[in-house]
């Protein structure tokens, strides 16, 4: 995905541009999306589902495709193809956990409608995302998730041994991060959009253009920072193009 950097990192004196204006003097940058597959003795968990292959037509009523084109993505880079490369079928996923229900995280949630996977988001996220008027609200697009049988969590929750969902509102009303405690690699915290990039994390923390509640956002960043300091965790940010290139990514790489 690509977008104006201002969406990710607010700077004074700038305005947000669309892809038709990407050659004007703005920071038009790569905005990677990612999913995380966690394998435990008690089941496989998929964290987020990224963007759909029909992004341009699905997003057309919203105009999101002009601000966040999911271009330069090969067919074999979409979620189902990446899982196939890893030898994992959709019906082998036991839990699909959505950090929040924005279009670039819930875009492939419907892939799992005819499987036995438990579909999970936070209670506050579900309450907002299913009940606003109309088909979309900002980056929430009901076509991605309406009608799915959602189970919800409230508060910080250990969903599997060594896997904790952390409430981190601010970006959305019910945004979550995920903490995974690994025997060899140690603790990893997948912030999702609670923290977009290393530059967002600071300190000091620097907010983004898409923040539902700024006070909650700052509090969530500091909450995550406290957990990192306690656990010496590796932070994996939501959309950090520089960091994603340094991580061990599937299908070749993994963390244990």
Predicted regions and their residues:
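Metal-dependent catalytic neighborhoods of phosphoester/phosphodiester hydrolases
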Residues: 107-115, 246-249
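Short amphipathic alpha-helices and their capping/turn segments at secondary-structure boundaries
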Residues: 33-41, 109-110, 177-189
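Metallo-beta-lactamase
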Residues: 52, 71-104, 111, 118-167, 212-232, ...
């Amino acid at each position: 995905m690509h977008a104006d950097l201002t969406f990710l990192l607010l700077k004074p004196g700038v305005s947000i541009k669309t892809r038709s204006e990407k050659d004007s003097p703005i920071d038009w940058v790569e905005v990677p999306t990612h999913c995380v597959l966690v394998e435990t003795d008690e089941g496989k968990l998929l964290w987020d589902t990224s963007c759909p292959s029909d992004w341009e037509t699905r997003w057309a009523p919203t105009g999101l495709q002009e601000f966040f084109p999911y271009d330069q993505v090969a067919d074999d880079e979409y979620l189902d193809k990446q899982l196939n490369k890893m030898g994992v079928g959709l019906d082998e996923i036991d839990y699909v956990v959505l950090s929040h229900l924005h279009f670039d995280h819930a875009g492939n949630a419907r892939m799992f409608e005819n499987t036995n996977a438990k579909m999970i988001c936070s209670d506050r996220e579900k309450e907002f995302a299913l009940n606003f008027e109309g088909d979309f609200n900002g980056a929430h697009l009901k076509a991605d998730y309406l009608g799915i049988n959602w189970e919800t969590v409230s508060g910080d929750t250990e969903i599997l041994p060594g896997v904790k969902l952390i409430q981190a509102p601010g970006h959305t009303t019910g945004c979550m991060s995920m903490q995974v405690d690994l025997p060899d690699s140690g603790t990893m915290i997948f912030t999702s959009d609670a923290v977009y990039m290393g530059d967002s994390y600071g300190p000091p923390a620097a907010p983004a253009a898409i923040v539902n509640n700024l006070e909650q956002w700052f509090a969530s960043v500091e909450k995550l920072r406290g957990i990192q300091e306690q656990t010496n965790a590796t932070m994996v940010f939501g959309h950090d193009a520089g960091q994603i290139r340094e991580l061990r990514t599937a299908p070749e790489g993994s963390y244990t």
